[in-house]
């Protein structure tokens, strides 16, 4: 199947609460009152704090998300605590354990987390340029001087992936390789770089990885690699924890479902008025759970272990 043609078709195509001292204690000094319980129930930490979880995409992840966190803090009146997991699996575990309140997931990470009991609801997906729809490209890359000309040439090579739970850095690449008759586990030597920028770096160096995969926003920063193929994947969701109080969930939807960078700047968040934030955020557009059915379909076709509940 021609992958360029397939790009168009693809483009169209229980959570446990963290124990926070809720059990009653004997004696008046340490007793937990009903009011205390009501204050902390449903939150990762407490009613004054929202924990914002992210996948570790690149070295600039926290800087990229800071203006959005500042905006959430301003609009909710709560402290927003940044939580960057060590890897995708750790973020999934944190979601299942109720340790995050709002988060930016990859599509695959969201599907994997909910398959395994995380109680999450998608709010929206970030788009980076005016006129775009949610979504971005998974790109197959090689060093600029490489003789590799197609995905078929990846067979037998050392190939950089991002993480076993990465949408554009593993799930869609696995599907594309399988379409070429290449098993991503046995017909290549997989190298998991951990982050998209590291996958690009290692591929560009051509030592640990002779080819690789990463999302387009990181690939475009490098002059050491060239693109072999690309596939559009569903946009990464901003999600909230279903355990939050209804009024807080409604507030997050109101804040994050449809907001532009100009809205955020106009609200008084000065940190949003920067080239760095403009490079990763233009606006959000609403998405729902059904939007990620394409990922579930790819999960079935690849039989990826990470998709299993």
List where the protein language model places each region.
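A ligand-binding cleft/hinge motif common to bilobed small-molecule-binding domains
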Residues: 104-118, 176-179, 201-230
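Bacterial signal peptide processing site
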Residues: 26-29
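C-terminal motif of bacterial Sec signal peptides marking the signal peptidase cleavage site
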Residues: 19-24
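Short helices/loops that flank or line small-molecule/ion binding pockets
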Residues: 83, 89-103, 116-117, 152, ...
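Bilobed "Venus flytrap"/periplasmic-binding protein-like clamshell domains
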Residues: 47, 51-73, 85, 108, ...
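An extracytoplasmic/periplasmic, membrane-proximal ligand-sensing/linker region
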Residues: 44-52, 57-67, 233, 240-309
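Acidic, polar ligand-binding/catalytic clefts
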Residues: 93-153
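Short beta-strand->loop
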Residues: 120-132, 222-233, 240
């Amino acid at each position: 199947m021609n992958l360029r043609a397939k790009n168009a078709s693809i483009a169209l195509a229980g959570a446990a609460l963290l124990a926070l001292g809720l059990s009653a204690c004997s004696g008046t000094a340490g007793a937990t009152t009903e009011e205390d319980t009501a204050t902390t129930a449903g939150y990762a930490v407490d009613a004054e704090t929202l924990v914002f979880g992210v996948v570790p995409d690149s070295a600039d992840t926290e800087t990229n998300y800071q203006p959005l966190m500042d905006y959430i803090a301003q609009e909710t009146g709560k402290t927003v605590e940044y939580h960057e997991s060590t890897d995708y699996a750790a973020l999934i575990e944190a979601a299942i354990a109720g340790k995050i309140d709002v988060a930016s997931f990859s599509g695959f990470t969201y599907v994997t987390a909910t398959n395994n009991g995380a109680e999450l609801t998608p709010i929206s997906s970030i788009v980076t340029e005016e006129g775009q729809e949610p979504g971005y490209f998974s790109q197959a890359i090689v060093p600029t001087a490489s003789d590799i000309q197609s995905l078929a040439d990846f067979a037998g090579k050392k190939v950089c992936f991002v993480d076993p739970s990465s949408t554009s850095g593993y799930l869609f690449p696995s599907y594309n390789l399988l379409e070429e008759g290449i098993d991503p586990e046995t017909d290549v030597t997989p190298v998991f770089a951990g982050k998209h920028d590291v996958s690009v770096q290692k591929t560009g160096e051509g030592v640990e990885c002779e080819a690789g995969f990463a999302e387009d926003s990181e690939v475009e920063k490098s002059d050491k690699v060239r693109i072999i193929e690309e596939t559009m994947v569903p946009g990464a969701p901003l999600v909230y924890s279903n355990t939050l109080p209804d009024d807080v969930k409604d507030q997050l939807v109101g804040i994050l479902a449809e907001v532009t960078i100009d809205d955020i700047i106009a609200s008084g968040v000065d940190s949003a008025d920067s080239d760095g934030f403009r490079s990763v955020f233009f606006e959000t557009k609403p998405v729902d759970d059904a939007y990620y059915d394409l990922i579930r379909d790819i999960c079935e076709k690849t039989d990826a272990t990470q998709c299993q509940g």
